[in-house]
Amino acid sequence: LHPRVRRQRQMCIRDSYMGADATVYDEIDPAITSTFVGYDKLTNESEITVLTTEEEVVDALSEGDKGTVIVDETVFYATMGGQEGDKGVIKTSEGEFTVETTIKLKGGKIGHVGTMTKGMMKVGDTATMEVSPAYRADTCKNHSATHLLQKALRTVLGDHVEQKGSYVDPDRLRFDFTHFQSMTKEEIAKVEDIVNEKIAEAIPVVTDVMTIEEAKKTGAMALFGEKYGEKVRVVAMGDFSKEFCGGTHVANTANIRLFKIVSEAGVAAGVRRIEALTDKGVMKYYAELEKTIEEAAKAAKAEPVQLVKKIAAMNDEIKSLMSENEKLKAELANNALGDTAGDIKEVNGVKYIATKVDGVDMNELRNLGDKLKGEIGSGVVVIVSAQGCLLYTSDAADEL
């Protein structure tokens, strides 16, 4: 499968697996809630309040069970706002649960969806919550990069640019925005340069919770059409970027390290989509690109730095060979046609010539037809070639 098709299929599979059936979650006591405490830490101790399998609410999970764990306080960020939920492990004195994704449930509950990989755990147990540091760190890099990207797009393209959607996970970022045409290579390069400049400036990323009125006074951007409560969280990267955002971010833009746009395309009328990479994703992208160039250079029997010149020379050689081939085909066609002066016939005052040639394609038949038209003057020309299939041309002189 094409990488983009495979990636889309994987995302569909991910989206289809959201833990237990919704009716199972409806059975949970609505008074039970969860609190997210993971903006500044990746581990915490908490009490298990709910356990479910994929079919029902249960009191305990045993090794091999797939299900959902709910605790009163968690450092796991749930999927929302375009950010993919955290992965990691939940440990108790008797067992270990691998968290494959974290989801937001009704009533303020946060569900940790995954598999019981060791022992067992029960409702009421004290659990140690551990988010995967690498997973969170890479997701944060991509999320913070989308904020820099939006501001860079508005700087290069204009203030009409507004976010229409986004998705971030540890591997890449996707950003949808309003714009009336495809971006030029120069515009994409300018946006990349701006983002990488802000990364190099090592700008501290500051978050603050304030009233929505206070947030608007700071110039922070809100997502169009989004509903906000009385208080909002504002993520600021110096004076360059300020946005309403509840997601997790790097502490400093320098943590993003690198930024690279890998695609820009339209997804709807007036909406464009950028896919991009950061840090290790960029390094991997260039490593794969370098490998491709080396393979191409090997096939072309040239050094990588000479590949462009080699390809240009090969193209010139191909054009020359094609031209020579056309000349040879014309000569062969003329030879196949032979001397036709004696083949010209006349019926009721109309001259005509009918002949057969072998090994001639349709293009050469037309050329031969033009040649014979010149010889016959006013009349009809019919040429037939049979090389597995019948090809013919019939040309009447212009006067007829």
Annotate the PLM regions.
Residues 21-129, 369:
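Conserved nucleotide-binding/hydrolysis modules and their immediate coupling elements
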Residues 74-87, 141-154, 240-258, 267-269:
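Conserved phosphate/anionic-ligand binding catalytic regions in large, soluble enzymes, centered on
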